[in-house]
Structure formats: C-alpha cells, structure tokens
Amino acid sequence: MQPTDWKPMQSVGAGVKEIRIRTGRKAYRTIYIANLPDAVYVLHVFQKTTQQTEQKDINLAKTRLARILRNR
C-alpha cells in the first residue's frame, strides 16, 4: 500500500521515497526506503522551510542509506 502524497527520491538512492505531510501552513517530509527484505528504514524526518528540499537534508539521508547498505 502506498501513501497518498509521496514521490520517489532518486537523488538519495534507488527505491527511496518521500512522504509529504501538510498541516495548515507547515510542511513535513519523511524520507524512507521500504524495498529491503528485512525492514522499512526511515532515513530522515524534517520540517520543510523552503520550496525545494535542502541539500543538507538530501546528504543526511544519503549518508544514512549508505550506512544501512554497508552494514547489511
């Protein structure tokens, strides 16, 4: 089952997705990967303050994904 408001985050890695949550004037994002056989991994959750996802948030998710894949 897919969330209703999401998009692929290929800039982070293959199979990574972003759930978009809006509450009033605030926006939140959850970056995760669910195509690994043992678990769903939440890579990063943050409040969005700009129109585009900031590079620091993408880099943090990439670093966490690399660590997960390296330790498998």
Predicted feature residues:
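Basic, Lys/Arg-enriched alpha-helical interface segments
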Residues: 1-27, 36-40, 47-72
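Basic, low-complexity intrinsically disordered segments
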Residues: 31
